[in-house]
């Protein structure tokens, strides 16, 4: 699954809401998917440890986290009601470009894991 993500991730590091959309679909970003995936990749990398797979998954998690920081983080907005913009819960029902609490949670978890925290937070 991690390799699939690596092969379908846009250059900016923020996944599209379905990772592999047909050209006819609007390419909404999904920051919540990026946050969940980045947190999971840090965990996967830790399971593998140093070496080819661990280093590859850490680099992918870093790319995704940097993409979220640069493109979706709204923590400098005093009026923001969340941490990340551009969450996509159910695009077909118009639930795109949203703030999603679970995206914020996993964003915080990914940030913590990126600096070495390894305890689960839930």
Segments from the language model and where they lie:
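Glycan-recognition and catalytic cores of secretory/periplasmic carbohydrate-active enzymes
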Residues: 1-122
